[in-house]
């Protein structure tokens, strides 16, 4: 298991690589090029500059999150061909820089969706939260205004200004697009890009929808175990993989997260994992919490145990954290609580490794634990 940390770059992040370097166990940075519009080719020289910054601080850059998919591809428009060719070239350029995994999603228009970016918890921290009634009572444009107002001036991943400026025409284009249509468009996309990824030694890793249900009437197709099976079977290749996110899938209590992790880990199709906890309320609303199992509705200990039992060799990162100790940062992406999350996850992993060594009669010093 390779521990990583998402970093938005020196121009977009309050968290520095120097600070991330002080978190024990972090080996790599999960990064992206945020100045390149969605659908355009990522220039090799820009990728190499990002890699240089990351390597200079002792980290690897082997996971990219995300190379976002242009709406024309999701809509299945004739113009998708240009954007698919651009995507292929971006894959090739990333492979030249040593990237191994590309995380992406296939959510129409909106990426992750929340009603609040700073809901106050009983302990005084603030978190991302989703209240269904609030979302149902506003229109998409109001949602955009709320997200922008709550972003503390930061660019939020998945909420690119160039896309959100065309919100009304986009909704008109999606009128009548069904889940089956969206699945067909994803299949076409995968049939085009997976062979390129395979040639380049890269694993594509689709991220679940967040939350895992329809928002504003838009179709969602990456929401449960059955959806994930369909996607894996669209193109039977190791390069067609999954990003398993406990918090995204876990927002629906019908999703058995340890079972989902166990099933796809056994298939060898999970190169990347996000772990976070959420508290699900009786009415279906949810809010994010610390990573501790007892603080939310998900059994993080059991999830890490499944990773350990599966001999997970891929990449993992703590997902959204609370805003604590007066930190002012991009909502969900401060330094302190994500660092706490890493120590919790590694603590569980180290404990499992220690028990494994005891069973095997190995008294090797704990410093030899590989994470």
UniProtKB/Swiss-Prot annotation:
Cofactor(s), by name:
Fe(2+); Mn(2+)
The domain of life for this entry's organism is Bacteria
Q: Please list the GO biological process terms of this entry.
A: D-glucuronate catabolic process
Q: What is its EC number?
A: 4.2.1.8
Pathway per the UniProt entry: Carbohydrate metabolism; pentose and glucuronate interconversion
Keyword terms, alphabetized = Iron, Lyase, Manganese
Give the matching SUPFAM superfamilies: Xylose isomerase-like
Under the heading Gene3D superfamilies, the entry gives: Divalent-metal-dependent TIM barrel enzymes (3.20.20.150)
UniProt GO MF annotations: ferrous iron binding; manganese ion binding; mannonate dehydratase activity
Top-level EC class: lyase
From the UniProt record, list the reaction(s) this protein catalyses. Answer: D-mannonate = 2-dehydro-3-deoxy-D-gluconate + H2O
- Role this protein plays: Catalyzes the dehydration of D-mannonate.
Q: Which family does it belong to?
A: Belongs to the mannonate dehydratase family.
- The protein depicted here goes by the name Mannonate dehydratase
Organism source for this protein? Answer: Geobacillus thermodenitrificans (strain NG80-2)
């Amino acid at each position: 298991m390779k521990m990583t940390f998402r970093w938005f770059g020196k121009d977009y992040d309050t968290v520095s690589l120097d600070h991330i370097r002080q978190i024990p166990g972090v080996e790599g940075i999960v990064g992206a090029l945020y100045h390149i519009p969605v659908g355009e080719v990522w220039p090799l020289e820009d990728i190499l500059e990002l890699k240089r910054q990351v390597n200079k601080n002792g980290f690897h850059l082997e996971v990219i999150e995300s190379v976002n998919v242009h709406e024309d591809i999701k809509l299945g428009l004739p113009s998708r061909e240009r954007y698919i060719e651009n995507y292929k070239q971006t894959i090739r350029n990333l492979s030249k820089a040593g990237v191994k995994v590309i995380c992406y999603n296939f959510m129409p228009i909106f990426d992750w969706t929340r009603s609040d970016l700073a809901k106050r918890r009983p302990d005084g921290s603030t978190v991302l939260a989703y209240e269904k009634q609030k979302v149902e009572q506003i229109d998409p444009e109001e949602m955009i205004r709320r997200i922008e107002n709550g972003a503390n001036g930061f660019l939020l991943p998945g909420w690119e200004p160039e896309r959100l400026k065309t919100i009304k025409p986009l909704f008109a284009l999606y009128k009548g697009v069904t889940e089956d249509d969206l699945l067909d468009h994803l299949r076409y996309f995968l049939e085009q890009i997976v062979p390129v990824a395979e040639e380049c030694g890269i694993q594509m890793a689709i991220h679940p929808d967040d939350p895992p249900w329809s928002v504003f009437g838009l179709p969602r197709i990456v929401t449960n175990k059955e959806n994930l099976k369909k996607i894996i079977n669209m193109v039977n290749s190791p390069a067609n993989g999954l990003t398993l996110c406990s918090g995204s899938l876990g927002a629906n209590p019908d999703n058995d997260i340890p079972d989902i992790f166990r099933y796809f880990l056994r298939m060898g199709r999970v190169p990347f994992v996000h772990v976070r906890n959420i508290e699900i309320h009786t009415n279906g609303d949810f809010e994010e919490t610390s990573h501790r199992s007892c603080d939310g509705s998900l059994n993080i200990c059991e999830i890490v145990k499944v990773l350990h039992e599966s001999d997970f060799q891929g990449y993992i990162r703590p997902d959204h954290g609370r805003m604590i100790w007066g930190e002012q940062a991009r909502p969900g992406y401060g330094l302190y609580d994500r660092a706490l999350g890493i120590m919790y996850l590694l603590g569980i992993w180290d404990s499992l490794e220690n028990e494994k060594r005891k069973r095997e009669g190995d008294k090797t010093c704990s410093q030899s634990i590989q994470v």
